[in-house]
Amino acid sequence: MAQTSRSADLTSGPMLQKIILFSIPLAASSILQLLFNAADVVVVGRFAGSTALAAVGSNGSLINLLVNLFVGLSLGANVVAARCFGAKDDHGVQDTVQTSVTLGLVSGVLLAVVGFFAARGLLELMSCPEDVIDLSALYLKIYFIGMPMTMLYNFSSALLRAVGDTKRPLYCLAAAGIINVVLNLVFVIGFSMSVAGVALATIISQTVSACMVTRMLMKEEGALHLDLHHLGFHMGALKQILLIGLPAGLQSTVFSLSNVVIQSAINSFGSTVVAGSSASANLEGFVYTAMNAFSQAAVTFTSQNMGARKYQNLNRVVLNCLLCAIVTGVVLGGGAVLAGTQLLHFYSSDAAVIAAGYERLRVICGTYLLCGIMDTLASSLRGLGYSVLPMVVSLVGSCLLRLVWIATIFQLNRTPFMLYISYPISWVLTAAVHLACLLVVRHKMRQRGQTLKAA
């Protein structure tokens, strides 16, 4: 197969070293994306007040609800491209590239239309506080206008990750992150644009990163080359992307739905708790994305090794990714708990907001390694070709459990803590079932001569 300029063989050599080298730029890229939101939250909280902070921060679960289905499709693009690359199938990689970029643009336009026109109605369904809803709706409408560029970046960077290139997406986001911070300061402080300014800064910076990473694909030689004149859907590639991506996207969407229900319950405690929870959630994101880099590594490494038929590497890949996720969760999650009050000061100087934020932070970050284990096991199953199985397990073990918890246990003791504790409980149960499924799948693969039959 014609190698791309920055591709990497993830099927041979020291796996732990390769996983770490692959994951560090990936984690840094994800953290830079979080810095977009952190810059929004910090600037608006400091210079536009607690109401504006709540307006920006409380939108995360709703944005994820609308976006995650299509982000799941980009995971499908990553798995299919990685498997074709591992199998040295140039034609398959090329079809996946053209189909993925087209799918990214189409899904982005669809999200922009739905998000723009449904923003206020969805916020009302979530019981968004009256003093926040107007600003929240304004932020959402502007944010979703930029969704085509966000989706274009997600799908294009997924293709680069599939061939082992995680550094160049990092460079794109670094440039965009600097632009985002500068524009935040200019729009909010210089022009007093409040939430409209931070939303506008975000979509401009995301447009920059999307254009950069797409340009990289256009300049590629070989199978990863993007030809804008040949954009379109190749049915074989599209079917494979949907088979992997739709279950992952549906899982993420229902996860987000359960989080929307939780956010609605948080909203019932007033704007102070909403602001504190929003600040904590932003900090939690840094711990999660660092762990999630190893979950994404598990998908790409297992997919390439499946394509190359190097089944003997699969157990090493999964164990090494789990080890890295656990260590990251312990170190960063524990550090966030220890320094939580000081970190929350960056988001607000209001003592009540900080106290409300720390109540959430100590529960979530203190147990976040459990989420890392759960996600890595689920990603490993997807990389092996089993996309429906982890979806069903996650929907029942996490989402349904949280909804039942809110309808029963939470009603007996309506406090923020009783909402937050539902997260680690669901992570433990779901991770245990994922582990059992993975052990059964590997046993069946060995029994039938390591021939994969996708669920």
Q: Model segments located where?
A:
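Residue-level signal for short hydrophobic patches within transmembrane helices
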Residues: 12, 16-35, 39, 62-69, ...
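Helix-terminus/linker motif at the lipid-water interface of multi-pass membrane proteins
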Residues: 31, 35-54, 123-130, 186-195, ...
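Short alpha-helical transmembrane segments in multi-pass integral membrane proteins
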Residues: 1-23, 81-146, 179, 190-246, ...
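Small-residue-rich hydrophobic transmembrane alpha-helices
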Residues: 53-113, 150-169, 263, 276-334, ...
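Alpha-helical transmembrane segments of multipass membrane proteins
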Residues: 38-42, 113, 121, 155-159, ...
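Alpha-helical transmembrane segments of multi-pass membrane transport proteins
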Residues: 17, 32-33, 70-71, 111, ...
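Transmembrane helical elements of multi-pass membrane transporters/channels
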Residues: 21-40, 142, 176, 205-209, ...
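Short runs within selected transmembrane alpha-helices of multi-pass transporters and secretion channels
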Residues: 74, 142-161, 169-177, 198-213, ...
